[in-house]
Amino acid sequence: MANTLEQLKLYTTIVADTGDIEAIKRYQPEDATTNPSLILKAAQIPEYESLIDNAIDWAKSQSDDLAQQLDDASDKLAVNIGVEILKLVPGRISTEVDARLSFDKEQSIAKAHKLVRLYKEAGVDKSRILIKLASTWEGICAARELEKEGINCNLTLLFSFAQARACAEAGAYLISPFVGRILDWYKKDTGKDYDAVNDPGVISVTEIYNYYKQHGFNTVVMGASFRNIGEIIELAGCDRLTIGPSLLEELANSQVDITPKLVAATSTVAAEAPLTEAQFRWDFNQDPMAVDKLAEGIRNFAIDQGKLEVMLTAKLAN
């Protein structure tokens, strides 16, 4: 009997949620995703020292202004790590726009253009990149514009049906609903434990997946942020699942019989009128879990971006 990970790959595209090249070599995912927290973690791996040095040298060659150097070094490092990962995966790398731009559509678009340009200069076509944006109204609007330019987007920090619907209506290439963080909120709020079948995060992704397929949306559903392999097994059949190294290892070392739990609808229903900004904001605001977790997620990514910049500032000063 094949291990659980190999069985899962029969029904779902597996993506590595890491910037660790050794982990990617080991589990052979199709794609990989990074975020500010993972870039910070990867930057502390000794093997990446040369990538950091390259980013610092490049940033210094672009400007004499320290703030600009810091911005450039941060972007270049994320791209350098992405380029290394793309040598190992046949598919795409997701690289995230600075979380501090989550409420600024124009600046998010400008940052996306810069990341795409840096990848192009490194010999990577935009067809192998997904630009990650927070699923705020502004992030979703930025994605709509970028998709029209042929720049595919991964809408992240997604916790609610309203966010998922707006992303699909904007033509986003892919969404990343956060399974485990939804579970975290409900466990804390109710004091209860949930098995995988009744896991609120699993239920949320299942609802979104079914809605997309029934309404003929092409946006890819990629479940993210898992707390245990039970959640992953319950989402077998989802378009994609992005999984961290520890859970990839657990899946590879277990033998659970996998059957697809999510199956695409064969018939579609008519699309509804797209959400207006007012409707989106109201529907989103009605979900206290989503409001809490989106705000927390943006804050935490911004904190880790700040920590990375402290590290880069010290190197720029040398």
UniProtKB/Swiss-Prot annotation:
What's this protein's function?
Answer: Transaldolase is important for the balance of metabolites in the pentose-phosphate pathway.
Q: Where in the cell is it found?
A: Cytoplasm
Q: What is its EC number?
A: 2.2.1.2
Q: Which GO terms describe its molecular function?
A: transaldolase activity
This chain belongs to the protein called Transaldolase
Q: Which NCBIfam families match?
A: PRK12346.1, talAB
The UniProt entry annotates the active site at: K132
As its record notes, the protein acts as a catalyst of:
D-sedoheptulose 7-phosphate + D-glyceraldehyde 3-phosphate = D-erythrose 4-phosphate + beta-D-fructose 6-phosphate
Q: Which organism is it from?
A: Shewanella baltica (strain OS195)
Q: Indicate the quaternary assembly.
A: Homodimer.
Pathway given in the UniProt record: Carbohydrate degradation; pentose phosphate pathway; D-glyceraldehyde 3-phosphate and beta-D-fructose 6-phosphate from D-ribose 5-phosphate and D-xylulose 5-phosphate (non-oxidative stage): step 2/3
Task: Note the InterPro entries from the entry.
Answer: Aldolase_TIM, TAL/FSA, Transaldolase_1, Transaldolase_AS
For this protein, the record's CDD domains field holds: Transaldolase_TalAB (cd00957)
GO cellular component term, pick one: cytosol
Task: Provide a GO biological process annotation.
Answer: pentose-phosphate shunt
Keyword annotations from UniProtKB, A to Z? Cytoplasm, Pentose shunt, Schiff base, Transferase
Concerning its family, UniProt says: Belongs to the transaldolase family. Type 1 subfamily.
Write the gene name.
tal
